[in-house]
């Protein structure tokens, strides 16, 4: 593998370019804006983008967002979401909202998500792949004359067939009215339905219902308790203000490790007994004794 060497300031230049590409997307037509054009673009587009962001998802009949569309998510026309019209000075009043493809010569008039079967396109009932169909409304097959329009019986991970899902384009207010996450306002182009790291997972696997992803400051700054992971307890610095300091140091770290002679049941039983002792000591207001490091 070739080793890349950057000159002084090169890493910062790379970060600035990535920031530029996330904000501008495909709007520069492949030619970089000058610094003046870039600043003018941000003054014009960013307020509009923050106010009129559209959230795009692929929704099942049960109301679950099985797929949250992002900048790189492919459309039925095989072009990415970021290559479609996503910024509006005024949000259209008609529903559904059409997001036409901006690639020259493409017949796609509205963004339409189609799932993949692993890395391959799914098949229509005419036995041809999705990318063998026309992106024009009706989605007729280009490889046969019997197909009346793309219709796939591919089953989503939620248990519903693909044809029962809909590509939904909605505003922030419409999404909040349904109790769905909207995340934080970001200036980047074509963010679609992405609201956090958990948005990359499929709907049935998405455990973070907040959609923001990162825990709040209150959670991050909360004191380490006896119920936390042994690693957090071991790395917790001693506190002079807490009346019930946790025992830290090598003894705590050793206690959390499995001893060579211990089987599974003995290890978990020792961990359980140590936790019970720590909880009892905490209730009595005493300093927590360091856990035993002797073999049980």
UniProtKB/Swiss-Prot annotation:
Ranges of Polar residues composition bias in the record: 237-256
Region: Disordered, residue numbers: 235-263
Signal peptide segment: none
One of the Pfam families matching this protein, by short name: FAM221
Family of this protein: Belongs to the FAM221 family.
The protein, known as: Protein FAM221A
Gene: Fam221a
């Amino acid at each position: 593998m070739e080793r890349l060497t950057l000159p002084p300031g090169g890493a910062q230049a790379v970060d600035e370019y990535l920031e530029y590409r996330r904000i501008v997307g495909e709007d520069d037509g492949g030619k970089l804006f000058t610094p003046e054009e870039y600043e003018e673009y941000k003054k014009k587009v960013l307020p509009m983008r923050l106010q009129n962001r559209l959230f795009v998802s692929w929704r099942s009949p049960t109301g679950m967002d099985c797929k949250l569309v992002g900048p790189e998510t492919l459309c039925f026309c095989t072009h990415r979401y970021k290559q479609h019209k996503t910024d509006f000075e005024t949000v259209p009043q008609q529903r559904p909202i059409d997001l036409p493809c901006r690639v020259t010569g493409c017949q796609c008039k509205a963004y339409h998500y189609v799932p993949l079967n692993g890395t391959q396109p799914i098949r229509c009932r005419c036995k041809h792949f999705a990318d063998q169909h026309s992106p024009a409304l009706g989605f007729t097959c280009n490889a046969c004359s019997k197909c009346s329009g793309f219709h796939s019986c591919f089953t989503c991970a939620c248990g519903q067939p693909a044809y029962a899902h809909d590509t939904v384009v909605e505003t922030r207010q419409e999404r909040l009215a349904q109790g769905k996450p909207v995340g934080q306002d970001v200036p980047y182009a074509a963010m679609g339905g992405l609201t956090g790291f958990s948005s990359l997972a499929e709907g049935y696997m998405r455990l973070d219902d907040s959609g923001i992803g990162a825990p709040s400051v209150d959670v991050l700054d909360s004191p380490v308790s006896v119920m936390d992971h042994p690693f957090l307890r071991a790395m917790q610095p001693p506190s002079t203000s807490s009346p019930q300091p946790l025992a830290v140091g090598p003894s705590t770290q050793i206690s959390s490790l499995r001893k060579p002679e211990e089987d599974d049941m003995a290890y978990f039983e020792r961990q359980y007994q140590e936790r019970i002792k720590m909880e009892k000591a905490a209730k009595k207001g005493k300093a927590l004794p360091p856990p035993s490091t002797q073999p049980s």
